[in-house]
């Protein structure tokens, strides 16, 4: 016989406390309860279980005697157990889980499930759907119920009830569909009690849309209509009666034996139509998610060549030709110099595009898409302004020192962003820095390690590529397997600073390209710092010298460079604009009475 699950029918009042019992609860929790004469284990643990969202119907209690667990009935008197230890475990049939809280902003109308007040910023359990304010978190039970798992348990429970072998008394006015859906006001509905845990109702909505955030795509659970607590208690009781009773080995009551399962439940082939429909819909939803999830993300960024119109050739660089084009507006299309790309090159190029498509910064040219047919091409925003090289060395634009320092700051800011994204430019120079709409710096032609590497078949060759004047010594020597680093970009930035602070290119007195490569690679040649403008601040001169160091370990990184320039900008003297005041356009004499003026003239 199974021990009774309810409280003992005793009218005796509990007497004084006689001791304590230590109780180990689920989820690695523990408590100490007071032992009183005339009280049972059921009564003593009632409060400790309810504050944790549990009840006696879904748990089993053991006595811990010499390290071994012995099942104990709930109606056992607590007084003889003074000084002992009890263990409470959740029945295996009851699918209780831990909460999965996420911070959420509720843009639709929502209310806290505890204080019932309006909720905008709060938390939500992805498993059971409970939502609450931060200051209401102490009222949330430590365990929750996955309602999708409960629905399957409900189906099996009702199927067993309809089999006749272990029938329970089901309320006659409730059908199967009514049992599985939230009920409105009825004789069985109880009002929410703040001390009792009320599970949210399963709404079973269709699969939510694929969101662009990293939040898991889970079924949203509505909590507007709380589930009838009497139904939950009834179902939990049906779970507990699924067991055939504990044997002599002290097995818990809630653990059904294989014999009891096979004798009480029907064949697995005879399933309810509702359960079959649910499993079919879940399978269809999984297929939809799989089809959407495994699509290559580059699919949405590759532009068909038929949609792009090339208008005018702008110029040719080291790695490609730039055209002005039309694709939903003016764009810049750079057709890269890659003849007959191999499969390895194509895959490496697409991998780089997945990195570049995530770049968004005010000082970086906006990446808009790419093309792989008939050749590699990159589509970026169109910049109306000219390059920094054109301003300094062709148009001979005159900038004051404050403007030059601001251009240097914006360039360092854009490079700092690229390095934070682990993108090495590899070809930073004044030709790839554009002044857009005034003095807004836009850095282009960044990344593209696939295109900027010499290939021999499927293997990259270790040869220097790029513009000689902006190459660091280690890039020219090519002694390392991969000489390109953050510090090599810093050296190129130092040459750009040299152009800004002198208005000329380095090594202009040497006409041989091979001689420049040899002498810079050996460390015999460096930019002439005597040409720097006389009004250049000393801090900028020191920064330029540090960026052009021969040893790359001695060069600063862009976070330090940016901080130095920003500090320099704040220290520069500025002409503060005076506050505007009205001008009366009259002299002080106009305000004096005429009699006073005549009297003043008579005074000797």
Swiss-Prot record:
- For bias kind Basic and acidic residues, which ranges apply? 272-287
Region Disordered, as annotated, extends over 178-222, 241-287
- Give the superkingdom in one word: Eukaryota
Q: What is its EC number?
A: 2.7.11.1
Q: How is the cofactor bound?
A: Binds 2 Zn(2+) ions per subunit.
Where does the RBD domain lie? 19-91
GO CC annotations on file: cytoplasm; cytosol; mitochondrion
Gene Ontology MF term list: ATP binding; MAP kinase kinase kinase activity; protein serine kinase activity; protein serine/threonine kinase activity; zinc ion binding
Q: How does it assemble?
A: Interacts with TH1L/NELFD.
Designated name of the protein: Serine/threonine-protein kinase A-Raf
């Amino acid at each position: 016989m199974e021990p009774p699950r309810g409280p003992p029918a005793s009218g005796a009042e509990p007497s004084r406390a006689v001791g304590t019992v230590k109780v180990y609860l689920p989820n690695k929790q523990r408590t100490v309860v007071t032992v009183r004469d005339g009280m049972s284990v059921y009564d003593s643990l009632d409060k400790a279980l309810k504050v944790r969202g549990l009840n006696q119907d879904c748990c089993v209690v053991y006595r811990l005697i010499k390290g071994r667990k012995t099942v104990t009935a709930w109606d056992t008197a607590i007084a003889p157990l003074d000084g002992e230890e009890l263990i409470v475990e959740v029945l295996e049939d009851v699918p209780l889980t831990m909460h999965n809280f996420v911070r959420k902003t509720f843009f639709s109308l929502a209310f806290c499930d505890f204080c019932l007040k309006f909720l905008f910023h709060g938390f939500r359990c992805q498993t059971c759907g409970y939502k609450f304010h931060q200051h209401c978190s102490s009222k949330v039970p430590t365990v929750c119920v996955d309602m999708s798992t409960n629905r399957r348990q409900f189906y099996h429970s009702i199927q067993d009830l309809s089999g006749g072998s272990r029938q329970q008394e089901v309320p006659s006015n409730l059908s199967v569909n009514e049992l599985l859906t939230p009920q409105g006001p009825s004789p069985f509905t109880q009002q929410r009690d703040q001390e009792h845990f009320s599970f949210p109702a399963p709404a079973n909505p269709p699969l939510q849309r694929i969101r662009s955030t990293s939040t898991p795509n889970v079924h949203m659970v509505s909590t507007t209509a709380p589930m009838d607590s009497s139904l939950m208690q009834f179902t939990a009781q049906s779970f507990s009666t699924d067991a055939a009773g504990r044997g002599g080995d002290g097995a818990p009551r809630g653990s059904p034996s294989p014999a009891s399962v096979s004798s009480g439940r029907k064949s697995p082939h005879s399933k309810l139509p509702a359960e079959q429909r649910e499993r079919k819909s879940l399978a269809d939803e999984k297929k939809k998610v799989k089809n959407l999830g495994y699509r290559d993300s580059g699919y949405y960024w590759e532009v068909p060549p038929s949609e792009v119109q090339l208008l005018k050739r702008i110029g040719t660089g080291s790695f490609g030709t730039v055209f002005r084009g039309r694709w939903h507006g003016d764009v810049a299309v750079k057709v890269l110099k890659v003849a007959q790309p191999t499969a390895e090159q194509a895959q490496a190029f697409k991998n780089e595009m997945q990195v570049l498509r995530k770049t968004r910064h005010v000082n970086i040219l906006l990446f808009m898409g790419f093309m792989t047919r008939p050749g590699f091409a990159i589509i970026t925003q169109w910049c109306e302004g000219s390059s920094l090289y054109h301003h300094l060395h062709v148009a001979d634009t005159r900038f004051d020192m404050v403007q030059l320092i601001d251009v240097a700051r914006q360039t360092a800011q854009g490079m700092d962003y690229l390095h934070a994204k682990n993108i090495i430019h590899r070809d930073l120079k004044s030709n790839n820095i554009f002044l857009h709409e005034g003095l807004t710096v836009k850095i282009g032609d960044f990344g593209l390690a696939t295109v900027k590497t010499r290939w021999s078949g499927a293997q990259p060759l270790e040869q220097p590529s790029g513009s000689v004047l902006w190459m660091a010594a280690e890039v020219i020597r090519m002694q390392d397997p991969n000489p390109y680093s953050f510090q090599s970009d810093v050296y190129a930035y130092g040459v750009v600073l040299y152009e800004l602070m002198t208005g000329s290119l380095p090594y202009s007195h040497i006409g041989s390209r091979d001689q420049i490569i040899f002498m810079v690679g050996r460390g015999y040649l460096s930019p002439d710092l005597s040409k720097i403008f006389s009004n250049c601040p000393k801090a900028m001169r020191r920064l330029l010298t540090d960026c052009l160091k021969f040893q790359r370990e001695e060069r600063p990184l862009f976070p330090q460079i940016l901080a130095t320039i920003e500090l320099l900008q704040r220290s520069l003297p500025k002409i503060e604009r005076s506050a505007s005041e009205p001008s009366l356009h009259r002299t002080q004499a106009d305000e004096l009475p005429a009699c006073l003026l005549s009297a003043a003239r008579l005074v000797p």
